[in-house]
């Protein structure tokens, strides 16, 4: 089959062996692929988690039709239209574990539309709903809201009934567009008083939930901008893998600080 493969120089289309599904995997004939930040990193020769380097097939999200099933796969059959979060998807065929595979609606979603959803939708549903436990009427801040995953977060927060949705972006042009995706207030996380802006918008209380894709330089101000008994969900580290952290403020505000990733989750999870 054909696949887009990382080489020492760039990427190129090569003929490679068609994958065989493991017991917990579906084999999909790929109809459309997504393109996200991690794909660009891998295509550029960098690593994303355990993925990367010469010989790697690019691609993390895709859609298509199930053409093969592992022995442990549940709730899927050959011919199902699906979208998947997996690896090596810029190819004619790709595999994904059934826990990160979702059926596509038959009537109102194309393969192309579906291929844009897995990474952003799975990531932010897991962050906002499963771990963040956002309730109707609560307030939320999305750090890094102008990314594809961030834009999905804004929409999920609105759909779940958040009374105030704040989004951050360091790019003025992108920041000005956040309202189109559900942001009631847009802030610049490089502004030294952004946490005060959040406090002003919440009557001094702080937000109930922060979805943090930045970490690093915003860590302490996140604590300042979070309500007592609020939650911070650590999704990404675009602002740095380490930073100052005021443990006293964390304790005083009794903040629940939760890290999330799919890399250490079981198939059933």
Which positions does each model-derived feature cover?
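A structural motif shared across PLP-dependent enzymes of the aminotransferase-like
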Residues: 86-99
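N-terminal Rossmann-like NAD(P) cofactor-binding module of classical short-chain dehydrogenase/reductase
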Residues: 83, 141, 187, 210-211, ...
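Short amphipathic alpha-helix with an adjacent loop that forms part of the alpha/beta core around
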Residues: 193-204
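Mid-domain Rossmann-like dinucleotide-binding core that forms the NAD(H)/NADP(H) cofactor-binding site
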Residues: 115-191
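Glycine-rich phosphate-binding loop and adjacent beta-alpha segment
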Residues: 217-269
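NAD(P)H cofactor-binding loop motif with strongest signal on the N-terminal glycine-rich segment
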Residues: 145, 214, 237
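Short, well-ordered loop/turn sites that connect or cap secondary structure elements
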Residues: 76-77, 134, 226
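Glycine-rich beta-strand-centered segment in the early N-terminal region that forms part
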Residues: 18-34, 46-88
